[in-house]
Amino acid sequence: MLIVFSGLPGTGKTTIAKGLAAKVGALYLRIDTIEQALRNSGALAHEVGRSGYMVANALALSNLPLGRTVIVDGVNPVMESRTAWSEIASKAGVELVNIEVICSDKSEHQRRVETRPGDVPGLTPPSWQSVLDHEYEAWADAPFSIDTALMSPVQAVSIVTQHLIAGRG
């Protein structure tokens, strides 16, 4: 199974995705970590662009056929990145579960963005203005959605787990 968490920075994707990965023993791929490793390597002359997503796609595709559940944590702001995950799941012959994480309380979302510590060495967390300006296309087909303004991270992991179990039933 390929589980892809999407949403703007500061919505709670990482907290929920890590919690779920620990709970189910899944392989966890975080786009921010991959992109920062690419920057740190000095291999790229310019901004990372889509290369972080391409690395994550390849890592997912190499692990899914081994029977591993893979959880991806990234903004996935455009149709191109979302379509790529669908293609990876199809190539691997596994189910794709898209989960969009939102925070409907704008003040709470801003507070999270402005107060969260950076947890990827070398990566400066985004500013609130950069989150507001971030490209984020509407979904063609609405995915399963979690609103972190309405629940704790523990509750969110529980709801996602229930959704995954119900989808297999």
Please report, for each region that a protein language model flagged, where it lies by residue.
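Walker A (P-loop) ATP-phosphate-binding motif of ABC ATPase nucleotide-binding domains
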Residues: 2
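Hydrophobic anchor at the beta1->P-loop junction of P-loop NTPases
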Residues: 5
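P-loop (Walker A) phosphate-binding loop of NTP-binding proteins
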Residues: 8
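Conserved substrate/cofactor phosphate-moiety recognition/catalytic segment
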Residues: 11, 15-66
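Glycine-rich phosphate-binding loop used to anchor ATP phosphates in small-molecule kinases
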Residues: 51-96
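Small-molecule kinase domains that catalyze NTP-dependent phosphoryl transfer to phosphate-bearing small molecules
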Residues: 115-159
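C-terminal alpha-helix
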Residues: 159-167
